[in-house]
Amino acid sequence: MAGNNSNNLKVQKLRYLTTDAIEITFKVPDNLKKEYKFIPGQYLTLEKKISDTYERRTYSISSDPISENISIGIKRIPKGRFSTYIFNNLKEGDELRVFTPDGRFFTDYKDNQNLVFVACGSGITPIISIISYVLRTKKNSRISLYYGNKTIASTMYSQRLNSLKNSNMENLSLNYFFSIEAQDIIFNQGRITKEKIENLISGNQISPEKVDGVFLCGPQNMVFQMKQIFKKHIGESKPIMSELFFSDEIEKPEEKKKEKFTKIETIIKIKIDGVEKRINLENKEENIIDAALRQNIELPFSCKGGMCCTCRCLVLEGEVMLEKNYSLERWEQERGYTLACQAKPKTDFVFLDFDRS
């Protein structure tokens, strides 16, 4: 199962990208290179014991697969336990527990593709990995990037992006937007909005019939709006990939109507790595990941917010309700997949298969 194995990797290099963003490069030993082979767009899950509590976070891979080692980009989150530790305590030579690459923010990259990318802030992290890889390996591919930040100084990977642009003048269209810094071009002043994307489409700067795939990465509100626009113009026949960075916690109307549970105790049977285990849920509000942690049962998870899909599993028996879902597609839910971090049982017995995730 991808992303479920872990090793202690040494921090080879720390590099500040901005005052609030840092790139960590991990040294991958030769005997682990196969395990840490990744597809551009995937992420790593890190784990560290902080103040007697084991914390996990997912961070997208920023490096090109051609690199000898593997890098991630991290932005400081106000009051964020993990990012605060990274910025205040982590040093070169330290070791962190790093799970093998996981994630589904990718498509079948081919020659002669026309790809559109929209990113905000740290959402550039997986996208720069994809762009670097596509420009290097896929002939005659055209890439258009629309990248929003507050200021030039707060822009992650700006030097690397500009270098890619200079090396690929005909194949990379690089468009910066700054919300609080004046721009010579009025259109690029302010945030990336649905109105601006609509203008680009109506002005034929983005031609829906020529687009082979769209990648969206950033805050929840931006991603949801952009996804609606591109689905309207491009339809369902072409991939529109999305990844959320730091959910805005926007409450959807349907989330207000939470079903009430009548059972006091629920039995959860799980299958993982070919072994079946049982978990008891004594609290009707407890999700499956938290119950497993309480009983010292190791299950794959990371964000615990319904965003990363690391805890995706298949419901074989029983029923569950998803509290939040920002990563499962409709077809996945129809086939019985759920997110263990957000799943709360509706029946007194549930059987989940993590091996078919």
Where are the language model's segments positioned?
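C-terminal accessory/binding modules appended to enzymatic or scaffolding proteins
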Residues: 263-300
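Short structural boundary motif marking the start of a folded domain
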Residues: 5-10, 262-268
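Ferredoxin-reductase
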Residues: 2-95, 113, 149-151, 162, ...
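FNR/FR-type flavoprotein reductase catalytic core
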Residues: 85-261
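Iron-sulfur (Fe-S) cluster-binding segments and ferredoxin-like electron-carrier domains
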Residues: 294, 310-357
